[in-house]
């Protein structure tokens, strides 16, 4: 879409924020011992003032570089876009204002506490606003046919087989068949796995069609292909092999643990009515897993602990994806941006991913590669496939749309105790952020003018957002303010601050606790038992680990050998 609408919203947001910030700073009293001409004094000899000024100058330089880049790429430059780019300096201006105010304020630490809270929570307030403004691409109501329907779709499932979870794999296959795409390609690493998957999928299809025979609208013409031509256990390679077998306008890439609803395709495809949309993401949800049965050989406490552990990890996995739902719905509404279109299920125009340049880059993505210095970089990457595709789409002039509603929901399982790999997944996801966000911000650069709000609301925060350290810093800073020291009810204020920080973690996760069957999770895992907040703090430490190991290039949880044994066992049986 044209850059102007996103830029206008960006300028509005980044006008309101500094105005409110300056207004708040003006309310904070100055030190009465300072002379009048000292008020808001700019003293470059002060290291904090010099540092904030340097950041502001650097941001102006960065904006000029962005303008040069846009010109070199023949991007359309309008007065609105040029003006909007300079609003990227607003955060640096707000920092400088805080430094100058802190130099003259009566309660310097209150200024810094205010700055810290504003820095942490402005994006939450902005995200809430845009979340409420979301609009779904609805199906046509005028009787005219949609641009695309399910027969225009090829579904590609990169898989190593069902492993231990045949039941989930079966539901995934049946859900795809219910939506009636033209073709489903199961792309496996090698022919022997394809030979094991093929009879399983055929049996699932046979039983599914037998159950549906006699019902209304039961014409089944979905073609199923199982291929092992990838010759490599790598999701990117397997996906490309599946893409090669697509002859439809739309390719739907699906994880082998993703289960759709019966109206999934007909609800998501209307997003492509906008010819600028090339990539579509959906709402994600996590299945509530049954708790383990009591073991008579264990004590009552041990049985309770086993149930609590199972429920905890299932809930943590659910909250992880629910947070993502909130983020993508809000950012996509704000300026069309997303941190990533999830690879669990995504729809894309076939012409984008059948391009030879795309395939070559997709299979040979390196990070920190500097050819002029002889640095090959890290790669080719195995993970990060969905981030790469998201970046590719916007860098090639197409838009992204999130279809967020019940019918456009993909359901999966996370936090299974019998196949526990959630921590490994968290590590992989965090490494992906540390690899891909800097690439998007400083190599691609497109989002600075295409998704300007998302730059500051999503891409930068995901790099530095470690709640353990920010929350401790906020509490410590508050206790050093004169306001706190002089208060007669110090610990009531401190308790209120802790409660606000605690409850702020509910903003993006509340959707999970609303259904009746999930309401008890609020008590057991959020409040008053702070299991989820404690996990969030533990994740902050995990994030430091992933920063230090971002170059580790693996894909946790895709155990070919285990899956192969399972499949061969089923085949023999």
Label each region the model flagged.
Residues 65-69, 81-82, 87-120, 131, ...:
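Membrane-embedded multi-pass helical conduit in multi-pass membrane proteins
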């Amino acid at each position: 879409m044209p850059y102007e609408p996103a830029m206008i919203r960006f300028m509005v947001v980044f006008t309101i924020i500094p105005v409110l910030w300056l207004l708040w700073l003006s309310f904070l009293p100055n030190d009465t011992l300072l002379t009048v001409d000292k008020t808001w004094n700019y003293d470059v000899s002060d290291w904090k003032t010099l540092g904030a000024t340097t950041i502001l100058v650097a941001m102006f330089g960065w904006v000029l570089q962005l303008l040069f880049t846009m010109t070199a790429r023949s991007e359309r430059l309008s007065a609105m876009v040029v003006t909007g780019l300079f609003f990227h300096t607003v955060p640096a201006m707000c920092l400088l204002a805080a430094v100058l105010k802190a130099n003259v304020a009566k309660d310097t630490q209150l200024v810094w506490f205010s700055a810290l809270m504003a820095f942490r929570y402005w994006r939450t307030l902005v995200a809430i606003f845009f979340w409420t403004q979301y609009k779904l691409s609805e199906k046509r109501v005028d009787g005219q046919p949609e641009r695309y329907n399910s027969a225009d779709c090829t579904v590609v499932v990169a898989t190593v087989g069902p492993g231990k979870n045949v039941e989930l794999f079966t539901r995934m296959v049946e859900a795809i068949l219910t939506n009636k795409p033209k073709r489903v390609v199961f792309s496996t690493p090698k022919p022997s796995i394809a030979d094991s998957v093929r009879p399983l999928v055929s049996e699932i299809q046979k039983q599914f069609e037998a159950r549906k025979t006699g019902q209304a609208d039961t014409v089944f013409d979905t073609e199923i292909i199982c291929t092992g031509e990838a010759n490599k256990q790598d999701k990117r390679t397997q996906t490309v092999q599946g893409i090669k077998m697509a002859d439809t306008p739309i390719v739907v890439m699906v994880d082998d643990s993703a289960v759709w609803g019966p109206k999934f395709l007909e609800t998501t495809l209307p997003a492509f009515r906008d010819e600028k949309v090339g990539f579509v993401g959906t709402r994600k949800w996590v299945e509530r897993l049954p708790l383990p049965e009591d073991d008579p050989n264990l004590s009552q406490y041990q049985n309770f602990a086993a149930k609590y552990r199972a429920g905890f990890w299932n809930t943590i996995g659910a909250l992880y994806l629910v947070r993502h739902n909130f983020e993508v719905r809000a950012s996509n509404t704000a300026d069309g941006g997303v941190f990533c279109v999830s690879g669990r299920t995504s729809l894309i125009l076939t012409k984008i991913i059948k391009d030879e340049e795309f395939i070559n880059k997709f299979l040979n993505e390196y990070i920190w590669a500097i050819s002029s210095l002889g640095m090959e970089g890290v790669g080719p990457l195995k993970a990060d496939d969905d981030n790469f595709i998201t970046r590719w789409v916007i860098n090639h002039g197409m838009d992204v749309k999130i279809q967020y509603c019940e019918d456009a929901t993909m359901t999966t399982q996370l936090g299974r105790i019998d196949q526990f790999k959630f921590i490994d997944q968290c590590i992989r996801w965090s490494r992906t952020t540390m690899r891909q966000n800097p690439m998007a911000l400083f190599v691609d650069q497109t989002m600075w003018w295409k998704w300007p709000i998302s730059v500051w609301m999503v891409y930068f925060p995901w790099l530095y957002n470690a709640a353990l350290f920010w929350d401790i810093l906020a509490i410590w800073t508050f206790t050093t303010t004169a306001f706190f020291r002089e208060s007669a009810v110090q610990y009531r204020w401190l308790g209120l601050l802790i409660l606000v920080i605690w409850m702020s973690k509910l903003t993006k996760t509340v959707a999970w606790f609303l259904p009746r069957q999930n309401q008890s999770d609020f008590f057991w895992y959020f409040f008053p038992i702070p299991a989820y907040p404690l996990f969030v703090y533990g994740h902050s430490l995990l994030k430091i680990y992933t920063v230090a190991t971002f170059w580790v290039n693996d894909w946790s949880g895709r155990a070919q050998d285990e899956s192969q044994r399972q499949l061969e066992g089923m085949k023999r049986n």
